[in-house]
């Protein structure tokens, strides 16, 4: 099971995401990095063994500029990147920013053109809020995606809360698909990681528990990492 640390980018700095209230995100404070400089945060992740990181460009998602220069500069680790793709134009825009081993995220929260789910070399984010998938049914999504496209179960309302993962939701999605499944939002401790591992989850996205020192990134990568 991969451990994929997260960076939320806003106004060129790393911020602490909580419950999807993006206007209220504050500069990141972390036990593993003294700076909210996203380059330094990414380096701290890599130094502790991370092979892939998740980046969300909150400015582009909110229609208020972008952080593409920062994303390009983080070229020393593989990335999966969410810019809130709505259209093919958005997808082509972010692909130009990424390296060949990076992947663009297509997320149900923002997607307008469901045909984009058929693209190769993407990651699809199943964005849930309070247990409900945003904008599409799961069957609609699964009828479009390629068999090898990873699916992120992202509980937006749980991001940054450390209130734990939704085991029933994870089981529900796993029962419906053989695609690789990632889980993000609300990881509170080792028990959540063990639960995801035992269920057969392929990767976990995590930030808050690492930055607060609840989980040691190097330790959990050594324990669960593939």
Swiss-Prot record:
Protein name (Swiss-Prot/TrEMBL): Uncharacterized protein MJ0703
Return the CDD domains for the record.
Answer: HisA_HisF
What SUPFAM superfamilies does this protein map onto? Answer: Ribulose-phoshate binding barrel
Renumbered to this chain, the signal peptide range is none
Alphabetical GO biological process terms: L-histidine biosynthetic process
Source organism of the structure: Methanocaldococcus jannaschii (strain ATCC 43067 / DSM 2661 / JAL-1 / JCM 10045 / NBRC 100440)
Please tell me one Gene Ontology term that the record gives under cellular component: cytoplasm
User: Pfam families of this UniProt entry?
Assistant: His_biosynth
Q: Which family does it belong to?
A: Belongs to the HisA/HisF family.
The source's domain of life comes to Archaea
Q: Which GO terms describe its molecular function?
A: 1-(5-phosphoribosyl)-5-[(5-phosphoribosylamino)methylideneamino]imidazole-4-carboxamide isomerase activity
Q: Spell out the PANTHER family in the cross-references.
A: 1-(5-PHOSPHORIBOSYL)-5-[(5-PHOSPHORIBOSYLAMINO)METHYLIDENEAMINO] IMIDAZOLE-4-CARBOXAMIDE ISOMERASE
